Regions:
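Transmembrane alpha-helix segments characteristic
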Residues: 16-23, 120-122, 126, 170-173, ...
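Extracytoplasmic catalytic/substrate-binding loops of multi-pass membrane glycan-assembly enzymes
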Residues: 35-48, 61-76, 83-87, 234-241, ...
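Membrane-embedded, lumen/periplasm-facing catalytic core of multi-pass transferases
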Residues: 54, 108, 156, 386-437, ...
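Membrane-lumen/periplasm interface segments of specific transmembrane helices
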Residues: 28, 208-302
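Transmembrane-helix motifs of polytopic, lipid-linked glycan transferases
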Residues: 91-112, 147, 151
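Signature aromatic-anchored transmembrane alpha helix within multi-pass, membrane-resident enzymes
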Residues: 18, 22, 117-120, 173, ...
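Short acidic/glycine- and proline-prone juxtamembrane loop motifs at membrane-interface regions
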Residues: 41, 66-67, 137-144, 348
Length: 513
């Protein structure tokens, strides 16, 4: 055992670690962008909104995206650096992700991980786990949310050890910053007084009253959060803030209607007429199954096992109040996730980023416990083999977050080729936002459709009289049917085909006037 790693990390050592983390984080972002230089679909939406904001068209920006702060941040970065909005998004996220890594290390230290070894382990987890690296090439708002969330959590854990007002202010500022990027930040912001009260070392006298108040706040926040997930972009008006009761009433009606529709689908398509009475039970079981499976997918199996191991053993946090606060944060995340699942009956992996990062705060202490405090000889041969397999598996999963080479290069190539042919507004129709973006026609919203079926129906109704080119993105199985359909029905042959590696094709057609 190297005793130098057991001693407390002084200021110089901490600054060296944070500096190295910043450099490595920027390098990882540059690498991920290099191997996946094709914009993501959400990125196209944010760029559209930023372009509207640049023109002072706030109404138009809100009609495109109902949470405009991230596009505004991209706009500011673009103006300051003088680069395009796509590059501005990459620069902003690279900086934000570097801040996330640094805040993760600082939060682990706030939990009691002040030794050199724990500081290095925290940096290692923050740099290699897929939750931090999988989305480095994406233009998304989640890094900004994680910065604010982790800042709030950092000050919350500092408050657990020393109840100073400045730490509470830090909690509010952090969660308020998080709410600029994702609405979940508002949930933590409004629940911060409850989280603070639960950090008290003395028993809370009115525990029943506090529990009732917390339940009411949780239900109201979950209702508004669910309504926000359901309401389409462009349907949000500034005037809604004047009638919060109407918001809650409308939200509850829409959520109840959505849940009833999903239960009806379960009754009609999954259960027979004699089993329809079990639809509510099936729906109730589906929710935790989706949360658990998505959690394992996001954390990955080896890291999930390490988290469970940490839950079963002493966390290693500085005190039990911090451990209790960590559990409260996890429960609050689960409430948010359950709300999403109840409404949508699915979860996107990156919805769990906040939950995953909170869970990963436990991992450095688990690794320190296994590698530092427990002797290798204490494990029998089977446990030694399992530990080695688990660690190697964890490293393999971490590497997988850094080898996401793009499979959509053909979309970019097709769009760039079309850019020279479709300079006039309305001249391109496509079923893919990325192709339209690289063609410079992403602002023609009416000409970008979600599927080939909608595109074909629009052609029948002559919906796009100014269109000169059609770009159809299809998978390998569907492409042959589409080619045959255009040949027989429309008498068109594709003039250009861009093929992707196991990712389908882009068929280019030129319309005859």
């Amino acid at each position: 055992m190297n005793l130098s790693f057991d001693q407390s990390a002084d200021r110089g050592f901490l600054l060296w670690v944070l500096g190295a983390c910043t450099v490595l984080s920027v390098a990882l972002s540059a690498w991920c962008i290099y191997i996946d230089d094709v914009i993501n679909n959400d990125g196209v939406e944010y760029i559209r909104a930023a372009e509207r904001l640049a023109l002072g068209d706030w109404t138009g920006a809100l009609s495109l995206y109902k949470w405009p702060f991230y596009p505004l941040f991209m706009l500011i970065v673009g103006k300051v650096t003088g680069v395009g909005y796509q590059m501005a998004g990459h620069i902003a996220n690279s900086v934000l992700l570097s801040a996330v890594v640094a805040l993760f290390v600082l939060t682990v230290r706030a939990l009691g991980g002040t030794s050199r070894r724990l500081t290095l382990l925290a940096a290692l987890v923050a740099l290699i786990h897929p939750a931090f690296n999988e989305y480095r090439a994406f233009i998304i708002r989640d890094p900004g949310y994680l910065v604010g969330y982790l800042a709030g959590v950092y000050f919350l854990f500092r408050y657990c050890r020393c109840a100073r007002p400045r730490y509470y202010v830090g909690v509010l500022v952090g969660f308020a910053f998080a709410s600029l990027f994702r609405i979940e930040g508002l949930v933590f912001l409004f629940c911060s007084p409850i989280l603070i009260v639960l950090t008290r070392t003395q028993p809370v006298r009115s525990l029943g009253l506090l529990a009732t108040f917390a339940s009411i706040v949780g239900v109201l926040l979950a209702t508004v959060l669910g309504w926000w997930a359901l309401v389409p972009d462009g349907a949000v008006k500034f005037s809604i803030l004047s009638d919060p009761v109407q918001i809650i009433s409308t939200a509850w009606d829409q959520i109840a209607s959505g849940i009833n529709k999903k239960i009806s689908i379960l009754q009609q398509h999954f259960l027979g007429p004699f089993s329809a009475r079990y639809s509510y039970l099936l729906f109730g079981l589906t929710v935790p199954m989706i949360i658990v499976s998505t959690t394992i997918s996001q954390l990955t199996v080896p890291w999930f096992v390490l988290t469970v191991f940490g839950l079963r053993n002493d966390s290693g946090f500085a005190n039990h109040i911090q451990a209790r606060t960590w559990i409260n944060l996890m429960l609050l995340h689960l409430m948010i996730l359950a709300t999403f699942v109840l409404i949508m009956l699915f979860l996107v992996d990156r919805y769990l980023l906040g939950f995953s990062v909170t869970a990963l705060l436990l991992i450095p202490f688990v690794l320190d416990n296994v590698l530092g405090k427990l002797r290798w000889q204490d494990f029998n041969r089977l446990k030694q083999v399992l530990i080695v397999i688990l660690l190697l598996w964890g490293v393999g999963e971490s590497v997988s977050g850094l080898d996401n080479f793009t499979r959509h290069q053909h979309l970019k190539e097709a769009g760039l080729w079309l850019a020279g042919q479709t300079a006039i507004s309305g001249s391109l129709v496509s079923n893919d936002r990325k192709v339209a973006y690289y063609a410079g026609r992403h602002a023609d919203l009416e000409n970008i459709v979600p599927s080939f079926g909608v595109l074909n129906n629009g052609l029948k109704k002559k919906r796009w009289p100014e269109a000169e080119y059609i770009a159809v993105v299809c998978n390998l199985d569907l492409c042959q049917k589409i080619i045959k359909h255009f040949k027989i029905v429309w008498k068109y042959d594709q003039i250009k085909v861009f093929s992707g590696h196991k990712a389908g094709k882009v068929l280019i057609y030129r319309l005859r006037r």
